[in-house]
Amino acid sequence: MDHGLSRRNFMKGAAGLGALTILGLTGGCEIFEATTKRIQNRPIRRNISSLAANDPIIQTYKDAVAKMKALPASDARNWTKQAQIHLNHCPHNNWFFLPWHRGYLYYFEEICRELTGNESFALPYWNWTTNRSIPAPFWGAGNPLNNTTRVATQTSQAQLSAVGPTVLDNILNEPNFLIFGSGQATSQRQNSVTGVLEGTPHNYIHGFVGGDMGNYMSPLDPVFWTHHNMIECCWVNWNLTRSHPNTNDPQWTGFTFSPDFVDRTGNPVTLKVSDTFLYPIFLYRFEECFPVRGLRERSSAELEEFAKRGAKVKLDFLDRVEVQDELTLDVGRPMTRAIPMKADLFRSALTTEQANRLLLTLGTVKPPVQSDIFVRVFVNMPDATPETPVDDPHYAGSFAFFESDHDEKHGSEQRQFIVDLTETVRHLRPKGAFRDSSQVDVQLVAVPFPDREPKAATVRVERLTLGISAPLQLE
């Protein structure tokens, strides 16, 4: 790759990133040459399932985890202390979810390097799209990467409806950051609309693994870090590979996480959202998770300019219909609600010639006591059940829960989720649906995780809102 790093471009980018400090280069005329070399040779985060059992990456990860577990409780890099950072500070269900976890992963990776002495170490990721079982390196008695609280077994497989390639491709092709990366918020613990990346594969995998992974002390399970590295890979692919802009709203870009993290020596770190934009350009890169054909490879200078610029992103609605009626979902008891729409606007979402979309927002959702079920959404299918295949044309999407309604530490227990019904209603129309009606019948089906008997599988939904969104305008 042509990295396109002129001295002028580098200094502009380094100023925005704080790259000189992060890269450990703070003076002298050799800064540019040394940093250029380091960027070009930055560590590669690889798919853990593609590594041999004795690969140095896996061994370094094991050594790092063992060393963190052996640190005294007074050390901020201690294994439990690292998990408590997540418990006490992590944003979920809002637009700070992605940049906060990006910083969290980076400083954890730095701690691994410091404790093991392996400066070339890069945290691997678990590609649950290609390997739907917990990878082999996380199992075995005496293995620092094992966790005995897991509910999933070595043979358990995550369901394609949550992590399959079709689902991921749809998520990565979502152009609106507020739908992809979760909705607007003014504080990091405020609940907004949960985005499709967080609400579907992210939440599902936490519940699928279970045990420690099912609550906000989830970093106690070493799987956590590779799972979130996959989420990070998704964001990099969405933003830098597929060229979808992040929002440039100053409420987001200028927000500071202070001081949530600690550096490799255990000292507190203050991090601004905009500081994280160039991490995957300057500090690490990924072995490609989702190859995309036909895209021109861009220089790092081009990527840097695009990542920093972002765009003014809105989610505007031409019409919205709200149904307030508390629904209680249990496994084996689907619920249906009819939502009437204005005929002319509804037709605008049915035609491919227009870019209007039909978006369902489920509001004031109270999750189950245990995160051992998820919800599938169907359209005009009153007999839908947990066994209904997701390749049925009436299927629209899924969402899952991370944490239970006992987790009051993380703010309000109520959630909001968004599901795009556009393609489903368009596919149903040629089959005779909506010919004489602009009413949409929505079915919600509670589904248990595979090979698992739900303990307390009740979900309450107090509000359904069906909206016709205007075409996305980026400025």
Where are these regions (language model features)?
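Intrinsically disordered, flexible peripheral segments
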Residues: D2-G4, R8-W95, P99-E475
